[in-house]
């Protein structure tokens, strides 16, 4: 397949860095930093599309659906990174947010040649997950033309799922195929075609927003506290205690006691203290209010 890179923003040359190979190290890094500053502003222009995607993901979660990221190379790795942080941060099941990469798990560490060029592989990977209409697919590719991702997007649409994409080329096959196209224009890279740089940074910022926003919308955050955090190591055990203290203004002993009584479920401990009820009552009320702390507390008061 012949690929024309000439019209891709991510493949064009950046005049600002034409002489970067002649600069002293500090000046070189200042130039890279100056370009990086443009990324957040580019992402800002896409906030309405990001918000639309967040709401679709949150609705899918409420209906028992999943968020599936799919990409190749850096894009795939970033999706896997974001997905892998959801269980420890928000207490989600590993299958609720999943990252797929062209070439499978071995491609996380090493490039798998030609994997990204096969559309059918993208569809096959979704089929292996039993992807269905309740799920949301987010295709990730700086170029917006990766066949592996396009194949997955085509399959996802065929089963009636919501399909979004993140691409740094606004007029691309992916943006045309998606229901929701998130396309920050970050401009040419410092090193021509090195889309792991500004494009990758933009992707990471957007992925952060997608999962964080969806978790907030589904009750996983109270105030600005990660109240469903799982205590999987010593640091997170302490974080749980600090979250309970911050949310309730109780003392350390009270926080530890409440957490012990509810098997270390941070959200339940907070409701126990704020509402003055026991662990079972707190769990029952939280379930009734779909895991949201504020309406749970209001119902008691």
From Swiss-Prot:
PROSITE patterns referenced in this protein's UniProt entry, alphabetically: GCKR, SIS
GO molecular function term, any single one: carbohydrate derivative binding
Domain SIS: 57-220
GO annotation, biological process: 1,6-anhydro-N-acetyl-beta-muramic acid catabolic process; amino sugar catabolic process; N-acetylmuramic acid catabolic process; peptidoglycan turnover
Keywords, sorted A to Z: Carbohydrate metabolism, Lyase
Residues annotated as signal peptide: none
InterPro entries: Etherase_MurQ, Glucokinase_regulatory_CS, MURQ/GCKR, Reg_chr_condens, SIS_dom, SIS_dom_sf
Gene3D superfamilies named among the record's database cross-references: 1.10.8.1080, Glucose-6-phosphate isomerase like protein, domain 1
Induction (free text): Induced by MurNAc 6-phosphate that releases the repressor MurR from the DNA. Repressed by MurR in the absence of MurNAc 6-phosphate.
Residues in coiled coil: none
The UniProt record lists the keyword Lyase: yes
Residues the record marks as active site: 85, 116
EC number, UniProt record: 4.2.1.126
Other remarks in the entry: A lyase-type mechanism (elimination/hydration) is suggested for the cleavage of the lactyl ether bond of MurNAc 6-phosphate, with the formation of an alpha,beta-unsaturated aldehyde intermediate with (E)-stereochemistry, followed by the syn addition of water to give product.
HAMAP family documented for this protein: MurQ (MF_00068)
Family under the similarity heading: Belongs to the GCKR-like family. MurNAc-6-P etherase subfamily.
Subunit details: Homodimer.
Name of the protein described by the UniProt record: N-acetylmuramic acid 6-phosphate etherase
